[in-house]
Design a protein with these regions (language model features):
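Metal-dependent peptidase/peptidase-like ectodomains
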Residues: 183-289
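Bacterial Sec-dependent N-terminal signal peptides
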Residues: 1-28
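His/Asp/Glu-rich mid-to-C-terminal helical/loop segments that flank catalytic regions of hydrolases
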Residues: 291, 295-350
Length: 350
């Protein structure tokens, strides 16, 4: 007869094996996640950016042949990677009619470029990774290449898409859908992101967050010599959950200095209102804006690929990838909890 104590010992042993197996599985998944992040390299970013910010793109001014060529570049990349277009039917271009742009510079329609990796568990919940791919064009024979602004954010999205696709091909999610949104018309008034949020391809109420990448390839003169920082703006405006997750992910995987200088409401630059994340925030979608700060080549023809700090840019991109990974794969969805708390406080005061 098996004694009561023997049964307990067997149960304890089985439980220990189960816990050990789970820990091993988690460890293996973390190791693979790090491998996917490390597939984002300085060399790959450089190769992409030298093509995307080349003179042949003519500065990518909205609704010009150079911008159209840049859109084709993005579509070709996604198709080569086996990543689907984000529009119904698998198309990549969200057309924006000329009349939508209140600008004398826009002479024809333009388009956002959208791709998607569907979620494996909650495909109707969306993380939107955004970057604007337009720039300020050319003046005569002088081309404004826009390598940092925002070629850097654009190719960062491409590298993250490739990493997420590798993970998906190996059966590792993402559990929620990842949308790669390349917006047009940012330089003339945030038009592309405004059009998307007014005409969303995926419902905004099911959009978990927007991680916006605009200028991540250079070093702010005020940070001279610091090769381990990034400015974060807006992470705690709508969601404390998102802010805390961002901090935890950075601490665990990257250990980069997260500088919130420009997150201050009293900061005179008002960067929170000056890039595409703001059009998501207006609809109460939690956001983070990743930014390296301005420099002497901002909106100058000297913003060229040779001046990019590629190892730092790779590390910044890996941080964004890890953050998106965590949001996409966690069991509980991120919400705009600051709004909920504010509403609760108002209700309590009544």
């Amino acid at each position: 007869m098996v004694s009561h104590y023997t049964r307990i010992s067997v149960l304890i042993l089985l439980f220990s094996f189960k816990v050990s197996a789970q820990e091993t599985q988690n460890s293996d998944q973390t190791a693979k996640r790090i491998d996917f992040a490390n597939s984002i390299t300085a060399n790959d970013l450089s190769t992409l950016l030298y093509s995307f910010a080349a003179d042949s793109m003519q500065g990518r001014m909205t609704a010009t042949p150079g911008q159209k060529k840049a859109a084709e570049f993005l579509q070709n990349f996604y198709e080569t990677q086996g990543i689907s277009g984000g529009l119904p039917g698998g198309g990549f271009y969200q057309n924006i009619p000329q009349e939508y742009f209140k600008s004398k510079y826009v002479k024809t329609d333009s388009e956002n470029v959208v791709a998607i990796i569907p979620g494996s568990t909650w495909p109707q919940e969306y993380i939107v990774l955004s970057a604007h791919y337009d720039h300020v064009g050319a003046k005569g024979d002088t081309i404004y290449n826009g390598a940092d602004d925002d070629g850097s954010g654009t190719v960062a999205l491409l590298e993250m898409a490739q990493a997420f696709k590798q993970a998906a091909d190996q059966g590792m999610g993402p559990k929620r859908s990842i949308v790669f949104l390349h917006v047009t018309g940012e330089e003339i008034g945030l038009y592309g992101s405004r059009y998307y949020t007014e005409n969303p391809i995926y419902p905004l109420e099911h959009t978990v967050c927007n991680l916006n990448t605009d200028m991540i390839g250079r070093i702010d003169p005020n940070k001279a010599g610091n090769e381990n920082y990034i400015y974060l703006i807006g992470s705690d405006k709508l969601s404390q959950e998102l802010h805390d997750l961002s901090e935890q992910v950075n601490q665990e995987f990257i250990q980069m200095e997260l500088d919130y200088t420009f997150n201050d409401e009293n900061d005179p630059n008002k960067f929170y209102y000056r890039s595409d994340h703001y059009n998501f925030a207006k609809y109460n979608v939690p956001i983070i804006f990743y930014f390296n700060g301005v420099h002497e080549d901002y909106h100058q023809p000297t913003d060229t690929p040779d001046k990019i700090e590629y190892p730092l840019m790779a590390k910044r991109t890996q941080l964004i990838f890890h953050t998106a990974w965590e949001v996409a794969n966690r069991d509980q969805r991120i919400y705009a909890d600051k709004l909920e708390n504010s509403a609760s406080e108002k209700s309590d005061k009544r």
